C-alpha cells in the first residue's frame, strides 16, 4: 500500500527526514515520496534517493520511488505552503523552513532543535567562478562592485543560495575599515547594479553564466 502523507515530518535533512517518515508508515508493496528541494541539489538527491531506495528495500522488502521537485528555496517553500503535497522538504535556509512552521503550520516551531547541528546536515562556502584567465582580475568582493564587471547571482527574493551570497557580501562590507550599515548597503547597491540577470535559482544562474556566456563572474556554492 502507498505511504499516507505525513506532513509534520518535514525536515531540512533528507537522510534523517526519510527515516523519520517511514517509521510512521505501514510496510507494503510500493511507496512514493516527494522531496521538494532547492535548485542545485538535483544531482545529489538523484544519487542519494537511489541509495536510500536500495537501503529501504533491503531493510523492509518495500519498494520506494522518490520524486523530486527543484527550484529556488524561497519559491519552493511558498509552493509547499500553498499546497504542494511534499513528504520531505530540503531547503537552503532556516528562514524558509521557518516559513513552513509559522505560515504553513506544517511542523513544530522548534524544528531546528530536533536534530544535531541545528538540523543542518551539510554546509558549503560561497565561491567566485570566473572566465578562463580571469580577464577582469577578480580576487575579492570589492572587485564585484567595480564598473564594467558583470556579476551573475540569483534573485535573493526567490533563491536561498542568493540570500547566502547577499549575506556573504554584506559580511565582507561590514569588515572593511570604517564600515557602517550605510556603507555596506551602498556597496551592495553597486554590486547588484552590476548584475545583468537575476534568475530565480542557482541552476538557472549557472546556465546563464556557463551556457549563455553572460557575466564575468558567478557567485555560487562551492559544492
Model regions and ranges:
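N-terminal secretory signal peptides that target proteins for export/translocation
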Residues: 1-7
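Extracytoplasmic/secreted envelope proteins and their assembly/folding machinery
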Residues: 42-49, 53, 73-77, 81, ...
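Bacterial N-terminal signal peptides
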Residues: 9-23
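Short, well-ordered coil/turn elements that cap or connect secondary structure elements
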Residues: 28, 61-63, 123, 146, ...
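Ligand-binding pocket segment of bilobal, Venus flytrap-like solute-binding proteins
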Residues: 176-223
Amino acid at each position: 500500500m502507498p505511504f499516507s502523507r505525513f506532513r509534520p515530518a518535514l525536515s531540512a535533512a533528507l537522510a534523517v527526514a526519510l527515516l523519520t517518515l517511514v517509521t510512521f508508515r505501514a510496510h507494503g508493496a510500493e511507496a512514493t515520496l516527494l522531496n521538494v528541494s532547492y535548485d542545485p541539489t538535483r544531482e545529489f538527491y538523484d544519487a542519494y534517493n537511489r541509495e536510500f531506495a536500495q537501503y529501504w528495500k533491503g531493510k523492509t522488502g518495500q519498494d520506494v520511488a522518490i520524486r523530486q521537485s527543484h527550484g529556488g528555496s524561497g519559491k519552493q517553500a511558498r509552493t509547499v505552503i500553498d499546497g504542494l503535497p511534499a513528504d520531505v522538504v530540503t531547503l537552503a535556509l532556516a528562514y524558509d523552513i521557518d516559513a513552513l512552521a509559522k505560515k504553513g503550520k506544517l511542523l513544530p516551531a522548534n524544528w531546528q532543535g530536533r536534530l544535531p547541528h541545528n538540523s543542518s546536515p551539510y554546509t558549503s562556502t560561497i565561491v567566485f567562478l570566473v572566465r578562463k584567465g580571469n580577464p577582469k582580475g577578480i580576487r575579492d568582493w570589492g572587485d564585484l562592485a567595480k564598473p564594467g564587471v558583470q556579476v551573475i547571482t540569483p534573485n535573493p527574493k526567490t533563491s536561498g543560495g542568493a540570500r547566502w551570497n547577499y549575506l556573504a557580501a554584506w559580511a565582507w562590507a561590514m569588515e572593511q575599515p570604517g564600515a557602517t550599515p550605510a556603507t555596506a548597503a551602498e556597496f551592495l547597491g553597486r554590486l547588484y547594479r552590476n548584475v545583468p540577470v537575476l534568475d530565480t535559482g542557482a541552476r538557472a544562474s549557472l546556465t546563464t553564466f556557463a551556457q549563455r556566456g553572460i557575466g564575468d563572474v558567478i557567485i555560487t556554492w562551492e559544492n
